[in-house]
From Swiss-Prot:
NAD(+) binds at S20, I21, D64, V65, I95, G96, K165, I194. The keyword Acetylation does not apply. Homodimer. Homotetramer. Transmembrane segments: none annotated. GO terms for biological process: fatty acid elongation; mycolic acid biosynthetic process; response to antibiotic. The record marks Y158 as: Transition state stabilizer. It comes from Mycobacterium tuberculosis (strain ATCC 25618 / H37Rv). This is Enoyl-[acyl-carrier-protein] reductase [NADH].
Length: 269
């Protein structure tokens, strides 16, 4: 039986731990036959140990999305990793960051612009940066997928990260216009809350007890609202949604947002 992604070469960014959504995307993609290239930032030795837990070995490249030299050399380094003459079929952007001043119990109005702009650069602008760097080495019919969290309402403790996700949604629509010139699609997956390392830290009080309590209420309310329920400890449904977008089965879908949240975004209570 062939896998959904057999023979496809896919770059996955954003693995930090084995609780990262990106880790589960990489795992499911490999289970479906994909050949991966991974990117990581900063703690590469630690990330390498984490990625060694995947079903198959994959090259790990350093990528700081704020570093213009890293971005300028990315296509060449990827080509070296996958072999001359080969191109990518998919790119996964699972990168997000906002300084603590822009999240948690810190008042929304008190976040310094320098911190907010850094968060928006990493969480939203970098989606366009990566697309620009990699589109020239992508095959027609390819797919770029970014990770979203529904920013249509003000979320407790998320503050400026919610604003960054709103920016990401707009960036995606423009990336879709540019990617279309290469015959490539661009979409986001809006996931429900997943207990990643960062989320667990917030619930544990890393951004203050009040913020932790608010996020815990958000998680509990999500499962109650979702018509089919929501398991915040299981990232596999989200990973499968991403892999569906990376496959050939949604060839006419681009510039869009696909929800993988148990349907909670459709329900008021």
């Amino acid at each position: 039986m062939t896998g959904l992604l057999d023979g496809k070469r896919i770059l996955v960014s954003g693995i930090i731990t084995d609780s990262s959504i990106a880790f589960h995307i990489a795992r499911v993609a490999q289970e479906q036959g994909a050949q991966l290239v991974l990117t990581g930032f900063d703690r590469l030795r630690l990330i390498q140990r984490i990625t060694d837990r995947l079903p198959a070995k994959a090259p790990l490249l350093e990528l700081d999305v704020q570093n213009e030299e890293h971005l300028a050399s990315l296509a060449g380094r990827v080509t070296e990793a996958i072999g001359a003459g080969n191109k990518l079929d998919g790119v996964v952007h699972s990168i997000g960051f906002m300084p603590q001043t822009g999240m948690g119990i810190n008042p929304f109005f008190d976040a310094p612009y320098a911190d907010v702009s850094k968060g928006i650069h990493i969480s939203a602008y970098s989606y366009a940066s990566m697309a620009k760097a990699l589109l020239p080495i992508m095959n027609p019919g390819g797919s770029i997928v970014g990770m979203d969290f529904d920013p249509s309402r003000a979320m407790p403790a998320y503050n400026w990260m919610t604003v960054a996700k709103s920016a990401l949604e707009s960036v995606n629509r423009f990336v879709a216009r540019e990617a279309g010139k290469y015959g490539v699609r661009s979409n986001l997956v809006a996931a429900g809350p997943i207990r990643t390392l960062a989320m667990s830290a917030i619930v544990g009080g890393a951004l203050g007890e009040e913020a932790g309590a608010q996020i815990q209420l958000l998680e509990e309310g999500w499962d109650q609202r979702a018509p089919i329920g929501w398991n915040m400890k299981d990232a596999t449904p989200v990973a499968k949604t991403v892999c569906a977008l990376l496959s050939d089965w949604l060839p006419a879908t681009t510039g869009d947002i696909i929800y993988a949240d148990g349907g909670a975004h459709t329900q008021l209570l």
